[in-house]
Amino acid sequence: MSSPLASLSKTRKVPLESEPVNPGRRGIRIYGDEDEVDMVNDGQDSEEKISLPSCYGGIGRQGLMIHDSELLTSMARKLQELEQQLKARNEEMLSKEQKILALEDLVQTLQQHQSSTTREEELETQCIQLQRQVGEMERFLNDYGLQWVGEPMDQENSEGKIISESDERDWMKAKKFWKPGDSIVPPEVDFDRLLSSLQDLSELVVEGEAQVTPVPGGAQFRTLEPIPLKLYRNGIMMFDGPFRPFYDPYTQRCLRDILDGFFPSELQRLYPDGVPFKVSDLRNQVYPEDGLGPFPGEGRVVGRQKIRKVTDRVEETSGSRMTAEKFLNRLPKCVIRQGEVIDIRGPIRDTLQNCCPMPVRIQEIIVETPALASERQRTQESPNMPVPPLSMLRIKSENGEQAFLLMMRPEDTIGDVRNLLAQARDMDSAAFEILSTFPPTVYRDDTVTLQAAGLVPNATLLLRTRRVLPANPSFGTDSGPGSLP
């Protein structure tokens, strides 16, 4: 066994050129009994190879193994730190995604709330408007001494159901073929009670009594005529038609008003103070609802020679039908609203001319008079004041194509009427005469008042070209109203 001094005296071996040398490290090779150890210089990051004697055994290998374990530990620690950072980033991203989803839900909720708020405001506005309309209608009913009673909810639903079903039915199915509604028993009507109620209502209004009717610039008296009303087993017919079956909601409403002791609400506008009824009790007859009237020709029975008229159906509707002229005569000629004279019959006449044959229309001309101007001013300033006594004159022209409407005072004279007509016609007042047919009278005295001439409250007069009277004294000119020459 050699001593340490002997090992130091050995010659250092030079490394071979084939072995790669890292320029960044300076290796120290230690030799000793053919043992070599590579040591790393941490200060210069260079590897040095130092040859150690064999007496040091495996010291170099142990140092290299320690360095590798530290490197692995460091790499594992860094990898663990990176994994923790990645996990933290993932958790942060998930948290941000949840916040984004929550914000999106909040935005959607706010948008829905905004739309619902707008809808609530619209509904509130509509509710306020409907409440105001209901209040106005209740005040209107109170003005006539009426009160809204209402209807049961189930009855309203049934009426709406009937209306909707009738709208959906085809004409052929409704008029020609059997339908499920035909098997339903119509509502029972107490005819005796209905006739008694109609009689009581007619007694409230005296037949032939004059009522105040609005006319241009004021009002006039009009004689009431009873309304014809026919009672059939399956419905009623008011005026000259159309036929109204009992299952119709509007007919039921009309009958309900009568049975409750009120005039039908549908007649309120035309007859605000009521109207008498002329009832025809035809409860034993059934009015045909198929729209087919009696066969107009003659029929033959098979196997017989006898010719007979088909008259075994319901009786023909008696009386003349409602013509357009009759309908227009039931309407007021004109009304005054806010100081303006509004023609009522004119626009309706123009509409009816497209569908109904109308006679030659008479042009109605409203003449501006002092009484009309004062009445217009009164309606604007103090409409609640009573209407003063007035006289409404309707004067037809010579050819009958024009009719002049004049609102006059009872103290106005014939001369005032003549001057107003001459001014409206743009002609001389001496070129025409004013006369009445019943009694036949010519109004030549211009100083006579309308009250003295019997032209109050209204009258219908005619115009004619002035005639030259002969010189015979027996046909002298009257100083006032006289008989026709």
Curated annotation (Swiss-Prot):
Keyword presence, rRNA-binding: no
Region described as Disordered: 1-26
A Pfam cross-reference name: UBX
Cellular compartment(s): Cytoplasm, Cytoskeleton
Species this protein is from: Rattus norvegicus
Tissue: Strongly expressed in testis. Also expressed in lung, brain and thymus.
GO terms for cellular component: cytoplasm; cytoskeleton
Molecular functions (GO terms): ubiquitin binding
Domain SEP: 224-288
Domain named UBX: residues: 386-463
GO biological process: proteasome-mediated ubiquitin-dependent protein catabolic process
Coiled coil: 67-143
Top-rank lineage group of the source organism: Eukaryota
PROSITE patterns: SEP, UBX
Gene that this polypeptide is encoded by: Ubxn11
Function: May be involved in the reorganization of actin cytoskeleton mediated by RND1, RND2 and RND3. Promotes RHOA activation mediated by GNA12 and GNA13.
Official protein name in the record: UBX domain-containing protein 11
Record PTM Phosphoserine, positions in chain: 479, 483
Subunit structure: Interacts with GNA12, GNA13, RND1, RND2 and RND3.
